[in-house]
Every structure is written in structure tokens, then in C-alpha cells.
Amino acid sequence: MDYKFLAGFALGFSSAIPFSVAGLYFVYLKISSHVRSIVNEYGRG
């Protein structure tokens, strides 16, 4: 077992988690704002 490779993989994986969470959060914000605009359109009509 190559511990350096394993440690590097764990470090890369743990450092990639915040980026993926931030990406999901931005996607969620875009979708929710889009849905809100659609709901507002129907609410006015």
C-alpha cells in the first residue's frame, strides 16, 4: 500500500468537497431564482 498516494488522494478528495458543495449551492440559487420568477409570472396573471 502506497501511503503517500493514499494521503494525497484523501487530501485532494477532502479539498474538492467544498468546491462541489459551492457549485451545487450556486446551481440551487440559479434554479430557485428561476422558479421564483416563473411563479411570479403566474402570480401576476
Swiss-Prot record:
Transmembrane segments: 9-29
Domain of life: Viruses
Record flagged with keyword Nucleus: no
Locations listed in the record: Host cell junction, Host plasmodesma; Host Golgi apparatus; Host chloroplast envelope; Host mitochondrion outer membrane
Keyword Transmembrane helix: yes
Any GO CC annotation of this UniProt entry: host cell mitochondrial outer membrane
Keywords: Host cell junction, Host Golgi apparatus, Host membrane, Host mitochondrion, Host mitochondrion outer membrane, Membrane, Transmembrane, Transmembrane helix
Record text about domains: The C-terminus regulates the targeting to host mitochondria.
Similarity-based family: Belongs to the polerovirus movement protein P3a family.
Role according to the record: Together with movement protein P17, plays an essential role in virus long distance movement.
SUBUNIT field: Homodimer. Heterodimer with movement protein P17.
Protein known as: Movement protein P3a
Gene it is expressed from: ORF3a
